[in-house]
Regions:
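Substrate-agnostic recognition of the 12-TM MFS/MFS-like secondary transporter fold
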Residues: 11-64, 102-160, 198-207, 216, ...
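C-terminal ends and interior cores of transmembrane alpha-helices
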Residues: 82-100, 290-304
Length: 534
């Protein structure tokens, strides 16, 4: 092992520790945050603090973006981890004197620092490892992060049983201190990362306003966040009614987060890739709103803690596994000049906007009905889930059109080995066929007409005798893809028709004039091309 490989191995080890600790701290922190807030305030105050947290988070993201334009992540993020660790100590000290204020401060603290630190950590990882080796290492780090989610839930539950909530705050501070040290030990980037000063938030909004596909992506993220806000309120409303003291709430939330962490990890590991390969991006994304709609109806009919646990658990499990992995693939068709400035806006700003809308809707419902029934909130979640399903249908169509257009124009390149979903595989095959068809037609026309003359009807009807096998196949492909009924029929009747041109016969099944003839010829080849027909 050379020195560079040894250094990378050490960096990876620290990254694995940091990822596990970071997500464990986040999950344990969420359990503590929820328990502390609900033990000091009625659940009807939850939308207010969520709105404040969303606004604070957006402000934090904008500030961090500005700082990262002048300070590298490896220098800035450890400092932010250290600051967060100190804030937990401050909240530990304040809790005995002002528990209400402390619970609000903790909520805002986690909202601002949570997204910033996770995003900053992945920026460090992306810069630290070279692109060639990054894919495999990132997969290992992501697995460590998933494991951290499970550990965090278990720790929150077990720690709450042996000590009070105040001591848990010191425990959370210690975890972020470990993150500060391990993240700093990951090391500096292996390559210089240029900062594009032309990329600004204003340009991102301009790009989104001019691209319908991006608008549908943003709309889906907003609706998913609204669903999450409604489902989370319904879940916590029932939980606060069943558990009265903060220690019981921490233990309950810790067990809940640990369970969804385990189930989400298993689902993504065992079925995530298979579902994408079998059903494509659209169907995979649709699983989340469909689950909310079904479980929401059950929750409306039977409003109990267990139905709300099922509803919230389904939402969390599918959001953190299938939805996230499939939604990330929606960026595939976008050229870099559109992807870079808009991804943060869609991923973060749209999510926070959804929090604001969802919490605003809850405040409106609470104004109308102060003793808001949980069933009403679940009904609203079902309605939003139905809207999300409609957006998924539109977005899937947009993805297909955008990817096909980008591939044909050559503005994006996709390595076939990197494709994990059925939708992209199908579009790549169609676009490759399109490019190959255009290339063949141009070559055939150039060979047949060196002086630029065009075919006449008499030329087309003439029998063409070519002894070269490749030339015969090329002419058959040219005829099959010409759009001319006479030439297509001539190709379908050619005795040289075989599996080598089957790919070009399949699209004819959608041609009303040629369906029967194409089907008749393909049935003789079907046993030899099962993969192309599925």
């Amino acid at each position: 092992m050379n020195n560079s490989s040894r250094t990378d191995a050490i960096a990876l080890a620290f990254a694995l520790i940091a990822a596990t600790t970071m997500i464990a701290q986040q999950v344990a922190g969420k359990a503590t945050r929820d328990a502390l807030f609900l033990s000091n305030f009625d659940v009807t105050n939850l939308p207010k603090v969520v709105i404040a947290a969303a606004i604070a988070s957006i402000a934090g993201v904008l500030l961090m973006s500005r700082l990262l334009s002048v300070i590298s992540p490896i220098k800035l993020i450890p400092v932010v981890f250290g600051l967060s660790s100190l804030l937990y100590i401050g909240e530990w000290f304040l809790l005995d004197y002002r528990p209400g204020i402390t619970s609000i401060a903790l909520y805002l603290h986690m909202a601002v620092f949570g997204a910033i630190l996770i995003s900053g950590f992945w920026s460090i990882i992306n810069e630290r490892f070279d692109p060639h080796s990054a894919k495999q290492r990132v997969a290992r780090i992501a697995a460590a992060a998933a494991l951290g989610g499970v550990i965090g839930g278990v720790l929150a539950s077990e720690v709450a049983k042996s000590m009070d909530v105040r001591a848990v705050l010191l425990f959370l501070s210690g975890l972020h201190f470990i993150c500060m040290v391990t993240v700093r030990c990951i090391g500096a980037p292996t390559r210089t990362i240029p900062i594009d000063n032309a990329v600004r938030t204003r340009s991102a909004f301009t790009v989104i306003s001019q691209t319908h596909y991006l608008q549908w992506m943003a709309a889906l993220m907003v609706l998913v966040a609204v669903m999450a806000a409604l489902v989370d309120y319904a879940f916590k409303s029932e939980a606060s009614a069943h558990f009265k003291d903060s220690e019981s709430l921490v233990a309950f939330f810790g067990s809940f987060y640990a369970s969804i962490g385990v189930l989400g990890f298993i689902l993504q590991s065992l079925l995530g890739r298979r579902i994408l390969q079998r059903y494509g991006i659209g169907m995979t994304i649709a699983i989340l709103p469909f689950t909310i709609a079904i479980f929401g109806v059950v929750g409306v009919a039977f409003t109990h803690l267990w139905t709300m646990v099922t509803l919230r658990g389904g939402q969390a499990i599918f959001t953190n596994s299938l939805f996230r992995s499939a939604f990330e693939l929606l960026y595939t068709p976008l050229p870099p000049h559109k992807k870079r400035p808009t991804k943060t806006i869609i991923d973060v700003a749209s999510d926070r906007l959804g929090d604001l809308i969802g919490s605003g809707l809850l405040l409106l419902l609470l104004f109308i009905a102060p003793n808001l029934p949980t069933a009403v909130v679940a009904t609203c979640a079902v309605v939003v889930a139905s809207l999300a399903l409609y957006v998924v249908v539109r977005l899937n169509r947009g993805y297909i059109n955008q990817l096909a257009r980008s591939l044909r124009k050559g503005v994006v390149r996709i390595d076939e080995d990197d494709i994990v979903d059925a939708t992209t595989q199908e579009i790549l095959a169609e676009s490759s066929a399109y490019s190959e068809r255009e290339f063949l037609q141009s070559k055939i026309e150039a060979l047949a007409h060196p002086d630029g003359e065009e075919d006449t009807d008499e030329d087309i009807d003439q029998d063409i005798s070519i002894t070269d096998e490749a030339g015969r196949v090329a002419l058959i492909i040219s005829d099959l893809t010409s759009g001319d009924t006479r030439r297509i029929r001539r190709a379908l009747g050619n005795p040289d028709l075989d599996v080598s041109v089957a790919h070009y016969m399949i699209p004819l099944l959608s041609n009303n004039e040629m369906t029967l003839e194409a089907r008749s010829e393909l049935r003789w080849l079907v046993t030899r091309i099962p993969g192309q027909l599925t």
